């Protein structure tokens, strides 16, 4: 029976669909799909688009500036943004035809480079959990956006961040909300999802925070949280907060540049293996988790796939993503899951990079520079773009990861959000 990433986080009608894979109470209401691996459980999607692209159902230009993704729950869409003068981060609710129901301010943005909101909300049992760029974790009612509780990670935990503030989607399961403030006080904390009261905290490495959303896995009948700081990737007991392993033995390739301590992508987990990359011209790595979940060992590293912050997906033994190439000449990559061999290194849209997700056996790539959205047929030897169209509304880098729910592709570009029929 295959092992899957767990996120026991909500209203779990979706769990019935996943019963055969032994994933209990998985929900799609958060970051990069129900398992945080970029794969959306859709069926019957188009395998080719019209020349002009899929049918646009609606667009709105008022979500506020940001790089976060929308979250769809029932007949509502939720998304974070910023107010007009960019002094507050906001949480908004929309109908599924693009009509805004309300907008509520919840936190203080990052006050340096790229201040736009980053947190994709986690929606659980009528509550939204968000983290501001300045490190405030806030619980809101999705009915009206009113605040339920908040914890200031800077004041309470002496949060320590890198150059771009906090970028994390909270992990919510059981009665817990998981947050990674990093710094000298602690690394990761669990808060009561109803009150914000601290339930446990891990030890501290004194490390700077990463830009990684934690995930909950199950392996050999045991659960574990996998998280990251700028230097450490680690596993935590979800009940006690005890750190059960950590890995920071990256060697000289990782320390070769000034960008070595970034960590901008959520890891992939499958069958006891953890794939993780730090981007910024630094190698990616595959770790093997021990059967008792108490240690890891390095299986291989790959010099080509240094994904910036667009994520990666694994399909049929191939890891797909884009690479950084000194932030100017990205390409699209395929790497063998088992061996780490680079299978292809392909140019698309004039040396580009961006985000990638998967659904119904196809890949969806979003070019961060040109705004091209590509429908890609998975292959072991090439990056085969079957159809593509271009996002023309919105402003800034195309950094928000796309989302597919109920046959609709949602693409954000800054203050603009578009919905396309892909079924």
Question: What does each of the following model-derived ranges do?
Answer:
Residues 16-17:
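Repetitive helical segments and hydrophobic/amphipathic motifs
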Residues 25-423:
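Noncatalytic, solvent-exposed loop/strand surfaces
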Residues 1-13:
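Bacterial N-terminal signal peptides that target proteins for export
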Residues 20-24:
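Sec/Tat signal peptide C-region and signal peptidase I cleavage site
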């Amino acid at each position: 029976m295959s092992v899957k990433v767990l996120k026991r986080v909500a209203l779990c009608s979706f769990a019935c669909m996943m019963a055969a894979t032994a994933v209990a109470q998985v929900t799609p209401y958060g970051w990069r799909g129900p398992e945080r691996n970029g794969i959306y459980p859709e069926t019957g999607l188009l395998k080719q688009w019209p020349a002009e692209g899929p049918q646009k159902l609606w667009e709105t230009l008022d979500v506020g500036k940001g790089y976060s993704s929308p979250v769809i729950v029932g007949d509502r869409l939720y998304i974070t943004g910023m107010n007009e003068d960019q002094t507050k981060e906001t949480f908004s609710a929309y109908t599924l035809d693009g009509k805004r129901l309300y907008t509520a301010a919840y936190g203080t943005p990052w006050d340096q480079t790229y201040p736009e909101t980053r947190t994709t909300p986690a929606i659980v049992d009528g509550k939204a959990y968000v983290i501001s760029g300045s490190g405030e974790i806030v619980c809101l009612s999705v009915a009206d956006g009113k605040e339920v509780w908040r914890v200031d990670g800077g004041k309470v935990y002496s949060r320590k961040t890198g150059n771009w503030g906090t970028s994390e989607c909270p992990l919510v399961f059981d009665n817990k909300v998981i947050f990674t403030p990093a710094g000298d006080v602690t690394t990761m904390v669990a808060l009561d999802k109803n009150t914000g009261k601290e339930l446990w905290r891990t030890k501290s490495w004194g490390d700077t925070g990463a830009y990684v959303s934690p995930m909950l896995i199950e392996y050999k009948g045991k659960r574990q949280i996998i998280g990251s700081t700028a230097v450490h990737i680690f596993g935590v007991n979800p009940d006690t907060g005890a750190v059960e392993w950590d890995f920071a033995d990256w060697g000289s390739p990782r320390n070769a540049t000034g960008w070595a301590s970034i960590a901008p992508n959520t890891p992939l987990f499958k069958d006891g293996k953890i794939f993780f990359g730090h981007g910024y011209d630094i190698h990616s790595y595959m770790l093997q988790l021990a059967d008792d979940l108490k240690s890891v060992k390095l299986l291989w590293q790959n010099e080509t796939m240094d994904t910036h912050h667009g994520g990666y997906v694994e399909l049929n033994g191939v890891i797909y993503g884009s690479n950084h190439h000194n932030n100017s000449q990205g390409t699209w990559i395929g790497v063998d899951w088992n061996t780490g061999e680079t299978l292809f290194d392909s140019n698309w849209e004039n040396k580009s990079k961006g985000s990638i997700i998967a659904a119904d056996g196809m890949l969806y790539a979003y070019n961060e520079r040109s705004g091209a959205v590509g429908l890609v047929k998975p292959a072991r030897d090439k990056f085969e773009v079957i159809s593509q169209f271009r996002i023309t509304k919105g402003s800034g880098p195309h950094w928000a990861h796309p989302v597919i729910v109920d046959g609709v592709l949602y693409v954000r570009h800054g203050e603009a959000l578009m919905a396309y029929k892909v079924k």
